[in-house]
Amino acid sequence: VQMPGCYICRPVIKGEYLLFAVIVTKDWGTYDGMLAVLNKNNKVVSFPGGSAPSYVDKTLIKPKYDQISFRNPHDVCIDDDWNLYVPQWNSGKTYPVKLTRI
């Protein structure tokens, strides 16, 4: 699966989805990152912490960080209610972020 500009961490499979943290999109000093959610066809359906997924001729366009949500997300864990837990690397000792499903 081609993920332009995305340095990814450990993938997690939940149901028909594949999720992973995008630890950085530029360089290690920019402290950015987001999550990626792919469907069963390996198409990105969401970039929490980033721009909406966009394709041109079936090729994913490099996503843009939203400048606020994460700081080098290093992993993603999912509970039975589909809440997401996101630890962050080199983030100034922040606690993991919990994203509650709505």
Give names to the regions the model predicted:
Residues 1-102:
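Eukaryotic scaffold repeat domains enriched in small/polar residues
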